[in-house]
């Protein structure tokens, strides 16, 4: 397909033409829209348009000689013509405006000539430079300036873009020399080539000098005069048509085919290139396919996502409507004996409206159609760009699927909770009333807040109000009666109805194995054994077969077998449970007459909770096993079970918090006391403290919770639940039901190696390895447990642990985890240990910032200035002071460095490295401390010097005193003589004269020098000072 007329790409004003965009849009839908771009430029009126018309049969406007030489082509004109080559089926011809025109010179708009040259060089596969023969050697007339522009833009932008797109061929420059003659053609070619190489060397970076032929290919056409040598001209044109086809096939080659874009996309690329060129920005031109691929892939992405959103919106509306209809129904209680109760069940109606399997298939089909549409329309574009948008499309499609699936799951969850609410209403009323009772709150608060702190026992005792716990035991009994009331024939038939409508899918027991191959179809799940479970849309549940309550456990198991829901493993477990002493007692709502002794109160409580919850699970659990649409559906927790767990959990939390609060108090105070010692064993001591606190808290929690459970569930005379001894001492059920006689290891050894409670292990083994794999089918949503094998009949199969969280069963196992040494205690002690570590780190940090600066000053001041009794210290010499100072300073610096971090190593606990503060803060504190240390050092020196003079002259004074004592008679005689009196009067007169003739500053300075000279026994200094003072007095 070609254009019938010439279309402007760039207008005379320098704008991108809207006509070209319209033409490209009209090319949309062409099977192969690729093309080769050929452009021609040269001086004005050099015959460019005429040459194109003769070569390609176009009709570009040519110059009218009668009107004079004027500008004919303005901007860039284009036309697409069919031209079959090995590379593309058509050629896009660009007729560029002539250079050096009078009109552009008058408009002072010669810059557009450069822009057109840049644009043509950027988009063309073949450049034709049209030049007159007689202009060879002239700079402007021969288009040398255009060649300089081509070389410049090529190495700044085009080379990088061509290499990025995989195009390593040289750019073809076809020089058309007009009005040429055969004579002198060879000389003309050499001259032109020499000029081109010279321009090349001047225009390109130095690293490309001498490599012209690696990047450009020059071809010459010598075309005779069209008017005066008509026949030769026509022959040459015919020859050139063949020549240009060979150029397309050979010189362009296969590399060009991989970089071409559809003609319909060329307007996008050309418009972007023109905007860059016109604004004189630094050209960073990506490959054609890259820029167009990004734009087109975005368009096709939007188209695909719009189609998907529209179709999914309809499905979403249908699902929403079905949910609204379902939730709008009045839910019936399944404790009634109405045969029609199951037909009104909200979940049944919801699945009749939108079956989960069929919904999944519809959504998957819509998503696949969306992706296929995008892939089909983007197959010709760059794979990297296609993948980027495909990833975004995939994310948006998944978001759309999740929106519908979330709505579906929300409807199922709300419907399930609506039905469970009717069943658990009596229990919820009772437990709500129990939780709202406040008569025990004061006693509870007093018992939790008045805890004696003892180290290392940490806490002496922790008790709770006995009335509250006795009341809780009565509430558990009421809950048991509610659960028992829920076991009715209607529940069994409800399971059957749910199975037939697709809510609960359980494969027959023969198909439970790791090799089952499940294929989802429109209305069935088919396995490799040929069996199937019907998933009928709109299927009505069958009528109940029995309408009476269960009077005994045998009738219950007989009726539940008729539903065909549970596996033989579950039948065997339930039957063994019902025949046990406690099972019969629970069924008849009474206790055994002569219960045996019990040795482990924890096991008794664990078994009580587990059996109550398991019995409850057998009636409620199937409602949780809904098809796995979203993760939210894994967390459908029955309200009654949640309240039960929360009640017991709150009691444990209260005990744990009381213990934890004491550990925090002990940790903070003991860490501060340890830090004040400040020795090299700081972190060793803190590690030991951590171990003492940890072990004390552990013992306290065990003792407190043991007291709590035993006082709540076991009578003081050890009667009540003592009949559980039979169950506790009996052989493990899983060995009788599920393992070969040669099996010697428990299946939970590899999964729960730390669990030591036999009851906990017994029920965990049964439910992990027999009941759950049968109940939580279909198999594709399960994973294997390596190294553990179960027996089914005579063949051994690998056990399967499904991805489902059967919340009631998990809650039951969590209740049995009240076996303190392994489950609840371990979890709590991890938190206690974390608090101990955090508080040690925090307390050391606070000690460092608040108390340690005083420690630094007090220690060195005490060490240098005062002794332990508070008296001033005496030293032998100044060197001893310096040695003591440096030694103490080194010790304080080492002490400060301890706060940079250390390891708490505790027996039976993992080692922990803590960092109370940073090295920067330590350095800053030491810098501040050193200034005070220097003052303390100078103070010690001053004290030493003072004491030194005192010690030196004390014997002189003592001798003088003894001498005066011995010669006191002669001293009195001298003092009373007339000579002494004269000398005294003379000295007083001199002193008075000095006082009057000198200033106080002069006297102080002189007397200070005199005193120093006397102290240092410097006679010369003494006489000099005396002489200067006499001179000041005389003058």
From Swiss-Prot:
GO MF annotations, alphabetized: GTP binding; hydrolase activity
Entry keyword annotation includes Nucleotide-binding: yes
Record-linked InterPro entries: G_GB1_RHD3_dom, P-loop_NTPase, RHD3/Sey1
Subcellular location: Endoplasmic reticulum membrane
EC numbers: 3.6.5.-
Record keyword Endoplasmic reticulum present: yes
Entry keywords, A to Z: Endoplasmic reticulum, GTP-binding, Hydrolase, Membrane, Nucleotide-binding
Transmembrane segments: none
Enzyme class: hydrolase
Pfam families: RHD3_GTPase
Entries under SUPFAM superfamilies matching the protein: P-loop containing nucleoside triphosphate hydrolases
Intrachain disulfide bonds: none
Domain GB1/RHD3-type G, residue spans: 32-267
Binding site for GTP: 42-49
GO cellular component, one term: endoplasmic reticulum membrane
Coiled coil location: none
Family: Belongs to the TRAFAC class dynamin-like GTPase superfamily. GB1/RHD3 GTPase family. RHD3 subfamily.
Function statement: Probable GTP-binding protein that may be involved in cell development.
Protein's name according to its UniProt entry: Protein SEY1 homolog
Protein's organism: Giardia intestinalis (strain ATCC 50803 / WB clone C6) (Giardia lamblia)
């Amino acid at each position: 397909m070609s254009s019938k007329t010439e279309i402007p790409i760039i207008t005379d004003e320098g704008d991108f033409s809207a006509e070209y965009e319209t033409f490209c849009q009209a090319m949309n839908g062409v099977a192969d829209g690729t093309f080769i771009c050929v452009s021609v430029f040269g001086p004005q009126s050099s015959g460019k348009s005429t040459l194109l018309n003769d070569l390609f049969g176009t009709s570009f406007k040519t110059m009218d000689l009668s009107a004079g030489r004027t500008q004919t082509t303005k901007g860039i004109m284009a036309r697409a013509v069919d031209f079959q080559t090995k590379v593309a089926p058509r050629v896009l011809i660009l007729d560029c405006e002539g250079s050096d025109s009078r009109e552009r010179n008058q408009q002072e708009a010669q810059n557009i000539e450069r822009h057109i040259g840049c644009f043509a060089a950027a988009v063309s596969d073949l450049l034709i430079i049209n030049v007159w023969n007689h202009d060879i050697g002239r700079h402007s007339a021969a288009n040398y300036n255009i060649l300089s522009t081509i070389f410049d833009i090529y190495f700044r932008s085009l080379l990088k873009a061509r290499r990025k797109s995989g195009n390593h061929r040289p750019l073809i420059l076809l020089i058309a020399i007009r009005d040429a003659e055969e004579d002198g053609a060879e000389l003309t070619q050499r001259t032109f080539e020499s000029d081109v190489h010279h321009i090349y060397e001047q225009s390109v970076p130095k690293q490309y000098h001498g490599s012209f032929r690696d990047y450009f290919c020059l071809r010459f056409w010598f075309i005779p005069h069209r008017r005066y040598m008509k026949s030769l001209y026509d022959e040459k044109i015919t020859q050139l048509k063949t020549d240009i086809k060979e150029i397309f096939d050979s010189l362009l080659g296969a590399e060009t085919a991989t970089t071409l874009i559809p003609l319909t996309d060329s307007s996008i690329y050309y418009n972007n290139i023109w905007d860059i060129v016109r604004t004189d920005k630094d050209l960073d031109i990506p490959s054609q396919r890259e820029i167009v691929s990004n734009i087109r892939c975005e368009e096709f992405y939007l188209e695909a996502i719009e189609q998907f959103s529209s179709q999914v919106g309809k499905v979403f509306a249908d699902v929403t409507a079905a949910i609204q209809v379902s939730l709008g129904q009045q839910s019936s209680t399944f404790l009634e004996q109405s045969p029609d109760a199951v037909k009104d069940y909200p979940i049944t109606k919801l699945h009749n409206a939108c079956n989960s399997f069929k919904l999944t298939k519809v959504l998957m089909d819509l998503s696949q159609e969306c992706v296929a549409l995008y892939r089909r329309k983007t197959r010709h574009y760059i794979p990297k760009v296609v993948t980027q948008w495909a990833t975004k499309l995939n994310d948006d499609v998944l978001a759309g699927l999740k929106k519908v699936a979330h709505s579906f799951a929300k409807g199922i969850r709300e419907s399930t909770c609506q039905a469970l609410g009717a069943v658990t209403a009596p229990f919820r009323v009772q437990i709500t009333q129990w939780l709202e009772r406040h008569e025990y709150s004061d006693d509870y608060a007093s018992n939790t807040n008045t805890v004696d702190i003892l180290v290392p026992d940490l806490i002496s005792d922790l008790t709770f109000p006995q009335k509250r716990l006795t009341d809780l035991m009565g509430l558990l009994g009421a809950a048991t009666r509610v659960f028992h009331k829920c076991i009715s024939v209607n529940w069994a038939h409800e399971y059957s109805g749910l199975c037939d409508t697709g809510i609960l899918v359980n494969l027959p027991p023969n198909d439970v194995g790791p090799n089952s191959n499940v294929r989802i179809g429109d209305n069935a799940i088919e396995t490799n054994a040929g069996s199937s479970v019907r998933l009928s849309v709109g299927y009505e549940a069958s009528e109940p077969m029995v309408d009476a309550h269960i009077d005994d456990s045998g009738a219950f198991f007989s009726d539940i077998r008729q539903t065909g829901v549970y596996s033989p493993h579950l039948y065997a477990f339930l039957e063994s449970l019902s025949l046990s002493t406690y099972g019969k007692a629970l069924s008849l709502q009474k206790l055994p007459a002569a219960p045996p002794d019990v040795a482990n109160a924890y096991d008794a409580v664990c078994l009580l909770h587990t059996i109550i919850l398991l019995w409850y699970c057998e009636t409620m659990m199937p409602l949780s096993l809904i098809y796995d649409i979203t993760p939210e559906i894994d967390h459908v927790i029955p309200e009654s079970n949640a309240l039960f767990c929360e009640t017991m959990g709150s009691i444990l939390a209260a005990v744990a918090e009381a213990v934890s609060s004491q550990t925090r108090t002990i940790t903070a105070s003991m860490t501060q006391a340890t830090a004040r010692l400040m020795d090299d064993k700081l972190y060793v001591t803190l590690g030991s403290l951590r171990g003492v606190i940890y072990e004390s808290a552990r013992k306290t929690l065990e003792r407190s919770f043991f007291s709590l459970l035993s006082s709540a569930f076991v009578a003081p005379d050890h009667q009540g639940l003592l009949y559980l001894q039979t169950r506790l001492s009996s052989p493990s059920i899983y060995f009788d039901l599920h393992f070969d006689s040669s099996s010697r290891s428990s299946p939970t050894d590899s999964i729960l190696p730390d669990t030591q409670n036999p009851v906990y292990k017994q029920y965990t083994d049964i439910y992990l390895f027999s009941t759950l794999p049968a109940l939580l089918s279909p198999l594709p949503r399960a994973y294997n447990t390596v190294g553990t094998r179960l027996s089914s009949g005579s063949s051994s199969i690998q056990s399967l642990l499904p991805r489902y969280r059967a919340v009631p069963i998990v809650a039951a196992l969590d209740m049995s985890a009240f076996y303190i040494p392994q489950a609840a205690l371990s979890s709590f002690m991890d938190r206690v240990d974390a608090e101990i570590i955090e508080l040690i780190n925090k307390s050391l940090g606070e000690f460092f910032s608040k108390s340690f600066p005083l420690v630094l000053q007090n220690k060195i001041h005490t060490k240098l200035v005062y002794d332990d009794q508070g008296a001033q210290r005496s030293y032998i010499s100044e060197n001893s002071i310096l040695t003591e100072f440096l030694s103490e300073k080194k010790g304080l610096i080492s002490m400060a460095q301890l706060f940079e971090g250390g390891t708490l190593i505790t027996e039976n606990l993992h080692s922990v490295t803590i960092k109370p503060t940073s090295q920067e803060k330590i350095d800053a504190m030491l810098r501040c401390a050193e200034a005070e240390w220097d003052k303390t050092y100078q103070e010690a020196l001053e004290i030493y010097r003072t004491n030194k003079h005192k010690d030196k002259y004390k014997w002189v004074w003592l001798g003088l005193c003894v001498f005066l004592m011995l010669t006191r008679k002669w001293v009195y005689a001298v003092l009373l003589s007339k000579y002494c009196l004269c000398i005294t009067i003379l000295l007083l007169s001199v002193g008075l004269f000095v006082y009057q003739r000198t200033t106080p500053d002069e006297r102080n300075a002189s007397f200070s020098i005199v005193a120093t000279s006397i102290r240092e026994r410097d006679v010369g200094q003494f006489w000099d000072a005396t002489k200067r003072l006499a001179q000041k007095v005389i003058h």
